[in-house]
Amino acid sequence: MKILLANPRGFCAGVSRAVETVEKVLEVEKSPVYVRHEVVHNKVVVDSLKKKGVVFVKEVDEVPDDAVCIFSAHGVSLKVEEAAAKKNLVLYDATCPLVTKVHRGVRLASNNDAECILIGHKGHPEVQGTMGQYRSKKGAIYLIESEEDLNKLTIKDPDNLYYATQTTLSVDETHGIIQALKDKYPNIKGPKKEDICYATQNRQTAIKAMLKHIDVLVVVGSQNSSNSNRLKELATLEGIDAYLVDNPKDVDKLWFDNKKVCGVSAGASAPEYLVQQIISQISKVCSTEVEEFEGIKEEVYFPLPRLLKQKIGTGKVE
């Protein structure tokens, strides 16, 4: 059996920035270092940081006053920011800059008393943070996951309406919902460029290009990773067996029975070393050759948070 490796795959610029932020903060600050929510949705990465002394918490209420705290890549609501300020925390914000961009759009809608429609998955931390940017008493923010949800909405002022999306959704599915929004509300405003992040788009594009060449897909990523699940879905929608794994021990020989080509990709929060471990495990259970599948080359970089750059002396605080 042959293995085809999707390109690009694995860590995106936002995840790299978030993980590097935690590792650098561990170097410049005294322990313990607290992180609100899993810094990225990958069990291997989180477990590794725990071993280095990071304490993960669900809410800033669990963090002692004046302690060091990091916000995860998914972003937080205004209420969480205010709670952190009251506790006088030494705060490092590892929110992905692309999520921050979505936050700005929602805050602008709120400031203009525009109603806002957010396309996203209920309960996802990014969605909670984005919903929490809206403060207008005259308007409201609504969460929808499908065109069916859209049909149930009652909008008070269609001429003062804005939409935004979670950054890690399916590009194809979201495009359909956005088009339905524009058809129903012709005057709706939204971001100049789609909120779906470049890395999510690129990884989905790479999978689509590879589908006609494979008969099974293994996606390296954790079960709670939204973008990893979307990669798996692209294959299953085409009738191709697909599996989501974040531990080499989870690889099952039966997956590859009577298969000729296995595609391997990784969600934006999965490190390359884990990809290589899983490829090695696949090779153990069935003889394989490994080939890189040509794709988009990513060269995006997001700088570290300003406070951290100041502490380590690699940049100026503006």
Swiss-Prot record:
The keyword Transmembrane helix does not apply. GO terms for biological process: dimethylallyl diphosphate biosynthetic process; isopentenyl diphosphate biosynthetic process, methylerythritol 4-phosphate pathway; terpenoid biosynthetic process. Its cofactor is [4Fe-4S] cluster. [4Fe-4S] cluster binds at residues 12, 96, 197. HAMAP family: IspH. Binds 1 [4Fe-4S] cluster per subunit. Belongs to the IspH family. The keyword Iron applies. Isopentenyl diphosphate binds at residues 41, 74, 124, 225-227, 269. It holds the Pfam family LYTB. It catalyses: isopentenyl diphosphate + 2 oxidized [2Fe-2S]-[ferredoxin] + H2O = (2E)-4-hydroxy-3-methylbut-2-enyl diphosphate + 2 reduced [2Fe-2S]-[ferredoxin] + 2 H(+); dimethylallyl diphosphate + 2 oxidized [2Fe-2S]-[ferredoxin] + H2O = (2E)-4-hydroxy-3-methylbut-2-enyl diphosphate + 2 reduced [2Fe-2S]-[ferredoxin] + 2 H(+). It comes from Francisella tularensis subsp. holarctica (strain LVS). Pathway: Isoprenoid biosynthesis; dimethylallyl diphosphate biosynthesis; dimethylallyl diphosphate from (2E)-4-hydroxy-3-methylbutenyl diphosphate: step 1/1; Isoprenoid biosynthesis; isopentenyl diphosphate biosynthesis via DXP pathway; isopentenyl diphosphate from 1-deoxy-D-xylulose 5-phosphate: step 6/6. Dimethylallyl diphosphate binds at residues 41, 74, 124, 225-227, 269. This is 4-hydroxy-3-methylbut-2-enyl diphosphate reductase. The active site is at 126 (proton donor).
